[in-house]
Each structure stands twice: as C-alpha cells, then as structure tokens.
C-alpha cells in the first residue's frame, strides 16, 4: 500500500521555519513528503499569528488550500503554529475548513492525529493545550540551502513588551542545554552545514534559566570548536543584554561573524517606555559605540516599529535623526500592528494607518540613501563569500555581513564553475542597490 502523501506550507519567521523542519522530521517515517500541495493527501499549514498582516496571510492560505479538497488529492487540512496556538478552538469555529489543529507544543502528535482522523473518520481534531515545548529539536529536515541552518537555542520570552503577543503564544523563556545544542551542531556539520544562525526570541539571554547566568559567549565558543562549522551568526539580540563578554567573543572568535541583529524598535525614551522596553537611548548608543569601537567592520542590522500609540512628530524626528546618524548596515521598518491581548491594544493616542504608512516610507527611503552611500566604499574590498547558487545564470553568494533572505547578496563574475557551499575570495567591483557585484579574486588581476 502506498504511503499517504503530506505537503507543508510554512509561513512567518525563521523560528517558525525551524518548527516546520521539526514537523517534516516527525512525519517523514510515516508519510511521503511532497512539495506540490496538489499531490498531497494532507496539507499542513504552519501559521504565523504575530501581527495582523501575518494572520491574514495565514487565513488566506488556509482558505486557498481548502479548495484542494475534492479538486485534487487533499483529504484534510492540518493547521499548526502560532495562529492555532493563539486562537485555539475559536479559529476552528471560524474556519470549518480546518480538519486537524495543533498548537506549537504538539508537533509530536501530528502522525497520531492524522491516523486517528483517517481511521475514526472524525470530523475534527483539536489539540492546542499549553505545555512547555519539548525543545529537543530532533532530526529536522532542513528547508534552507544545504550549507546553512538556523539553530534555535531557546524558546519563549520573558520580556513582555506591550505590543507583543509572543509570550502568550510561546510561553516562558526556556534554553536548550549546551550539550543538546552541540549534539545538533555536530549532526548539522556532518550533513555539510557550514553556517549556523543562532536564533531565539532573545538570543542574548541564553542560559539564564538553566545555568543562572547568561551563557551565549560560552555557547559560541563551544560551537566554534566543531569541525566544519565556519560561520556562526547572531540574530535577535536584545539591545540591553549585549554585554562586554558577547562583544569580546564576536571580536576575538574568528568563526563568529562580525554581524549582529539588534531589534531596537525605537530610540525615543518616551516610546521605549510605552513599549515596555527595559533599556533607554543612552544604553543603546553605548552598546552601538562599544561594538563599533571593538569591531571596526561590524555589520549591524536592526528593525524599527513606526506608528506606536503616542508616537509624536517629535518622537519620529528623533528616530529619523538617530537612523541618519548611526547608519545601520541593514534596517527593516514595520508599521505598528494593534493586537488584541497586548497592553498596547488599549493605549490611547493610536496613530492613523495613513500616518504609519507615511512614516514607514520615509524611513525606508532614508535607509535606501544610506545604503547607496555606504556601498561605494566597499568597491575594491576583498571578502570571503559563501557561494549560494545561480540566479538567471549569474553566481551569487553572501559575505559575513549578509544574513540569508533578509540582507543583500554578492553577484559573482567567474570564468569557471563554482561549487555551491564553498567559500571563495571575491573582489567587489560594483554595487546595485542593496547588492554588491564582484569577481573571483584570483581572476581579478588583483
């Protein structure tokens, strides 16, 4: 008898991507995994429920895939992830197209639930009770390029920012043990992974719950000893938790990329206080200055929220001036999303959607000009580049300052075939918006 075919659609952030990889790892022994949902008996949709646009994308995807029932092979729609965890049975009542629903803690029950649905001919299965997630990631099926993997070092969050629903969805902050992480790292290395990207809701607090102290520097040091791992990249670093020890480890450890992602959200002390952020402008400036003093080629990425309740014209001007002066290497701007269940939802002085959009556009245009002015100084530089593949016949890759999917790439001119997943030296010859253009160094004539 042929195995059931299962397809998966993953929405949302890279932390959700890791969940999707765990789901695929859990079902691979029981079912055949297909990439085309038209061929799937069951379609799993791993949803995001963080902000309004993400919720709408999840709902639209559920409705679109539900049309495959009767039209193609689909016998059932399975909904997992943050949207399922956030709304539970309410979501199932709203969308009767859903047959099976699992929260963020129940991925190990997926095969059992699908089998029960088939054998018992049950109409619905709902399984979204809360319990601490088993943070042993298990045997994932990587959905990234074979040489790069996201490595989740902790789950949950204790920060409780006033705009954020994640602690209610994902629970308290829980670190994985160093031993568990290193075991997975060794396995990833044996599979050909060269770049591990450390992620969590807050990577800088790693270890505080397990070891009663923050252990991120020790973790990075341990990972760097694993043969085959060449790049360690840090995302989601809470600004006030960036200690001198973390900065020193980035500066001194050759395998840790001189790159850091710090979601600042704002710079006005007034807005930071309303957001429930612990640090203030002086703390942020101190840490940025310390990073740049100790690591002269550090690449700093950040994300900003505009239109938070109470954001005045003065607050926005302060934010704009800050971005203009600091000149981040990469920056993302998001419009504040008013989410039920958060403290900010009930705040006065909500900003109009029109003004949010205008402020978002203004900051993105500013960042575009900043990038243009910074890129020209990279022409003539030589970088170690991780070869990623080809786009329209042109090789491309990334250097230490480029995280996958969210930052730019380097297009590589080469007279010979390159091997995906290898590191090569590239001399930069030009820039195109957020991307760079270069030539293989030994072909550049120096």
Swiss-Prot record:
Residues 143-373 form the Radical SAM core domain. [4Fe-4S] cluster 1 binds at residues 13, 48, 82. One of its GO terms (molecular function) is metal ion binding. [4Fe-4S] cluster 2 binds at residues 157, 161, 164. InterPro entries: Elp3/MiaA/NifB-like_rSAM, Methylthiotransferase, Methylthiotransferase_CS, Methylthiotransferase_N, Methylthiotransferase_N_sf, NA-bd_OB-fold, Ribosomal_uS12_MeSTrfase_RimO, rSAM. It is found in: Cytoplasm. This is Ribosomal protein uS12 methylthiotransferase RimO.
